Curated annotation (Swiss-Prot):
Organism: Saccharomyces cerevisiae (strain ATCC 204508 / S288c) (Baker's yeast)
Region: Disordered, residue numbers: 83-118, 200-226
Consequence of substituting residue 215 to R: Impairs sumoylation
Pfam family, one: DEK_C
InterPro entries reported in the protein's UniProt record: DEK_C (IPR014876), SWIB_domain (IPR019835), SWIB_MDM2_dom_sf (IPR036885), SWIB_MDM2_domain (IPR003121)
Residues recorded as bearing Phosphoserine in the entry: 113, 225
Protein localization: Cytoplasm; Nucleus; Nucleus, Nucleolus
Protein name per Swiss-Prot or TrEMBL: Protein TRI1
Example GO molecular function: RNA polymerase I cis-regulatory region sequence-specific DNA binding
Function: May be involved in transcription regulation.
DEK-C domain sequence ranges: 1-56
Basic residues: compositionally biased ranges: 91-110
Lineage per the UniProt record: Eukaryota, Fungi, Dikarya, Ascomycota, Saccharomycotina
Domain of life, per lineage: Eukaryota
Comp. bias regions, Basic and acidic residues: 200-218
Length: 226
């Protein structure tokens, strides 16, 4: 296992930017083979287990996608170097130093306080079954996923023969059915998470519709009498 641990930073990086509904151990493994120019067929089982383990950890701790210790790896150093090269042209323009400084200050100030529209902060409304399961009417989406994963691990609901499969208990069944895969969880959750702004907008549209119908009905009455 120690030999494949060197792939952890890259596995985390791939998982953190991938759509959880579409990603799979096979795709991540193929990406590793291309990036490292190696054949991992002989270690397929170990690599798959590592990918599943990292996926679970990332879903449970969505705000800590890559461990700090792993940032010293070659791949992460390369990413940071490329990022610095992209930023270099902005720093080299000394004529606009004042504007650049004011922009950077504004960016820094903006980054210091959490954005209320950020996916990690913005709360969504939960469906009735999900409210009953988690005990809250609204939560940030990332917190919902984290709490579900904590419940899965605490109750040991992963299939021991296939860790990708979650065997739902009575509390989870109303939301996810009898079983699901760890990669389909996010897709299934979309049916139980609602944007408050969209609900308010929908309610306002519904209120306006009857008024329009009444107006049209009243306008048609004179024609009938004539």
């Amino acid at each position: 296992m120690a030999d494949i641990n060197k792939y952890i930073p890259m596995v985390d990086a791939i998982l953190s930017v991938s759509n959880p509904d579409e990603i799979s151990p096979k795709r991540v493994r193929k990406a590793l083979q291309i990036l490292y120019s190696v054949n991992l067929d002989s270690q397929r089982k170990l690599i798959n287990e590592l990918i599943l383990e990292r996926f679970g950890d990332i879903q449970e701790n969505p705000r800590v996608l890559i461990p700090k210790n792993d940032l010293i790896s070659r791949d992460q150093e390369l990413s940071l170097r490329l990022q610095k090269e992209e930023e270099r042209p902005l720093r080299s323009t000394r004529k606009r130093k004042g504007k650049s400084e004011s922009k950077s200050k504004r960016k820094k100030k903006k980054n210091d306080s959490p954005d209320s529209n950020s996916i990690s902060v913005r709360k969504v409304l939960l469906s009735a079954p999900l409210q009953k399961f988690l005990g809250s009417e609204e939560l940030p989406r990332t917190q919902v996923v984290k709490m579900i994963w904590q419940y899965i691990k605490e109750h040991d609901l992963q299939n021991p023969k296939d860790r990708r499969e979650i065997l739902c208990d009575e509390k989870m069944e109303p939301i996810f059915g009898k079983k699901m895969t760890m990669f389909s969880m996010n897709k299934l959750l979309t049916k139980h998470l609602f944007n408050p702004d969209e609900i308010v907008k929908h309610e306002e549209e519904q209120k306006q519709t009857p008024e329009k119908e009444i107006k049209l009905e009243n306008e048609s009455l004179p024609n009938l009498s004539g």
